[in-house]
C-alpha cells in the first residue's frame, strides 16, 4: 500500500461523499470544484480521462499516471455502508473493475507498483499506478 495513493483515494472518496450532486452524466471518477484540485465531469465516453490520470501528480509527489476504480456517484448515497470486503466483492463482480485489479485485458501490460484505497459510507475508491511511491 502506498501512503500517497491512500491519500489520493481518501481525498477523492471524501469529495464524492461530500460534494453536491453533479450532472447525471458525471460518474464516480469526477471531481467537484470544492477542493484544491482541478474539477472535472468524467463521462462514460472517457473524454475526461486525463483528469483522472493526472490526479496523483496534481495532488502528491507521485509524478505518475493514476488509474482509479470507484463505487458511488458524486453527491449520492446509496444507503449501503461499505467496508473493504464489500468494496472488493463489488469490484470483483464487475469484469472491467476486476481486470484493473488483476492486470487483465487492457491492463495486462501494466504492473501496479503502488496502490491505495479509501472508503466512506457508500463510496469507495482504489487508485493504482505503475510507478512506486517515492516516500520511504
Model-derived features: positions:
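Functional surface patches built around histidine and acidic residues
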Residues: 1-136
Amino acid at each position: 500500500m502506498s501512503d500517497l495513493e491512500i491519500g489520493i483515494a481518501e481525498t477523492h472518496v471524501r469529495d464524492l461523499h461530500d460534494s453536491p450532486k453533479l450532472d447525471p452524466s458525471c460518474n464516480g471518477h469526477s471531481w467537484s470544484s470544492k477542493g484544491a484540485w482541478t474539477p472535472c465531469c468524467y463521462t462514460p465516453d472517457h473524454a475526461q480521462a486525463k483528469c483522472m490520470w493526472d490526479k496523483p501528480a496534481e495532488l502528491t509527489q507521485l509524478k505518475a499516471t493514476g488509474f482509479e476504480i470507484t463505487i458511488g456517484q458524486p453527491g449520492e448515497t446509496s444507503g449501503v455502508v461499505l467496508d473493504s470486503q464489500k468494496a472488493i466483492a463489488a469490484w470483483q463482480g464487475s469484469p472491467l473493475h476486476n481486470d484493473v485489479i488483476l492486470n487483465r485485458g487492457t491492463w495486462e501490460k501494466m504492473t501496479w507498483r503502488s496502490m491505495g484505497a479509501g472508503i466512506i459510507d457508500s463510496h469507495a475508491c482504489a487508485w493504482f499506478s505503475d510507478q512506486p511511491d517515492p516516500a520511504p
